[in-house]
Curated annotation (Swiss-Prot):
Homodimer. Keywords: Cytoplasm, Isomerase, Porphyrin biosynthesis, Pyridoxal phosphate. PROSITE patterns: AA_TRANSFER_CLASS_3. This is Glutamate-1-semialdehyde 2,1-aminomutase. Belongs to the class-III pyridoxal-phosphate-dependent aminotransferase family. HemL subfamily. GO terms for molecular function: glutamate-1-semialdehyde 2,1-aminomutase activity; pyridoxal phosphate binding; transaminase activity. One of its GO terms (biological process) is protoporphyrinogen IX biosynthetic process. It is an enzyme of class 5 (isomerase). It is found in: Cytoplasm.
């Protein structure tokens, strides 16, 4: 069966043929591939074509596809049972590792997705402060729950819609959307909504409008202004947690949030999410406190065992972060040089082992500047690269990721293929 035939079949049974909109490749004008398997830095489609993968399932596969360490741990857990609805030892071990690595939380609660982690963190913030409003930032994506699918990036930006039908205006009215990196707007919001703001929710490095780096003065401002106004600072580290550093963005930038949300890497490609905070906050979560949150599959042994294997590897070999950062810098420097030689305006925003190429001549510091990108040109670049065997995220507004399986040889091969893709632009 060809990719085209399989996708036509998928469309018969699933909306748009996908389980998540960006997978339809609509914004890049490409025929979607249907994956058969992944191995190391590669995926292979059902036609047998191999691609060097820089999506990595949108971030969780920091050790690459089908890592022996991860697969072995999953099989060990699976041999004991796939779900219990009761606390298991893998869950306890993973929670201990997350807490020790983060250095900013005392307790953690597992859920089944990043969306659930953020939903729970918002409820916790509102329950503690008894205030209604949440501040988020234009272009930051925090999952698809009603409270935060306002001014979102990622798939919503790709579809070109501001939110989605089905969310009552009353929900949106309690979410204040500001520009990323704008200190003045932040100050004005706290004046206008004095004593009504429960929390500021932020991706400390935006990854869902493409990679957008925070001004460090702005991050510090977030911390200071929330403390001054008895509001909580929530870091959505679903992408950046264990990606920027062992302690995530909190460690990388030296800013301590009140609540941290995790996902992706802590499950190694299995469904998972988590949120954590200091004891005085987490003691308000049921069953210790009155703020309710629950889930049948939360902390399921397969997901937490997978995450446990990854975190143990990262803790044992902390130099992984430096190696990945150096490899990313080599890739992006050479890629930028190729684009410049071709006379193509671009900006590459990069940090640790993640980056985004924006086809624009403007510095990208927020969603407005990200949207100056030539998305049609990106689409052509994507299609050219796909033909050459390089799989990048199928949206201008997503991050590329590297894994430990991306060796120097793999990156050199990538650059050879991308040179051909660029020459055809």
């Amino acid at each position: 069966m060809t990719n085209k035939e399989a996708f036509e079949l998928a469309k018969k049974y699933m909306p748009g043929g996908v389980s998540s909109p960006v997978r339809a490749f609509k914004s890049v004008g490409a025929e979607p591939i249907v994956v058969n398997r992944g191995f190391g830095a590669f995926v292979e489609d059902i036609e047998g074509k191999k691609y060097i993968d820089y999506m990595l399932s949108f971030g969780p596969l920091i050790l690459g596809h089908r890592s022996e360490i991860v697969v072995s741990k999953i099989m060990e857990a699976l041999d004991k049972g796939n779900s219990f609805g009761i606390t298991n030892m893998y869950e306890i071990e993973l929670s201990e590792l997350i807490i020790k690595a983060s250095k900013v939380i005392d307790k953690v609660r597992f859920v089944s997705s990043g969306t659930e982690a953020v939903m729970s963190a918002i409820r916790l913030a509102r329950g503690i402060t008894n205030k209604p409003y949440i501040i988020k930032f234009d272009g930051c994506y925090h999952g698809f729950s009603d409270s935060v699918l306002v001014g979102a990036g990622s798939g919503v930006a790709t579809l070109g819609i501001p939110g989605t039908p089905g969310i009552p205006k009353e929900f949106a009215a309690l979410t204040i959307v500001l520009d990323y990196n704008d200190e003045n707007a932040l100050e004005e919001a706290f004046i206008k909504y004095k004593n009504q703001i429960a929390a500021v929710l932020v991706e400390p490095v935006a990854g869902n409008m493409g990679v957008v780096l925070p001004k460090e003065s702005w991050l510090k401002k977030l911390r200071d202004i929330t403390k001054e106004n008895d509001a909580l600072l929530i870091f959505d580290e679903v992408i950046t947690g264990f990606r920027l550093a062992l302690g995530g963005a909190a460690e990388y930038f030296g800013i301590e949030p009140d609540i941290v949300c995790y996902g992706k890497i802590i499950g190694g490609g299995m469904p998972i999410g988590a949120y954590g905070a200091k004891n005085h906050i987490m003691e308000r979560v049921a069953p210790e406190g009155p703020i309710y949150q629950a889930g049948t599959l939360s902390g399921n042994p397969i997901s937490v065992a997978s995450g446990l294997a990854i975190l143990k590897t990262l803790i044992k070999d902390i130099a992984i972060y430096d190696r990945l950062s150096e490899l990313r810098a080599y890739l992006t420097y050479t890629l930028s040089k190729m684009l410049s030689e071709k006379g193509i305006p671009h900006r590459i925003n990069e940090i640790a082992s993640m980056f985004t190429i924006f086809f624009t001549d403007k510095d990208v510091i927020d969603f407005k500047s990200a949207k100056t990108s030539d998305t049609a040109l990106f689409g052509k670049f994507f299609r050219n690269a796909l033909k050459e065997g390089v799989l990048m995220p199928p949206s201008q507004f997503e991050a590329w990721f590297l894994s430990t399986a991306h060796t120097k040889d793999v990156v050199d091969t990538t650059l050879e293929k991308l040179k051909k893709a660029i020459d055809l632009l």
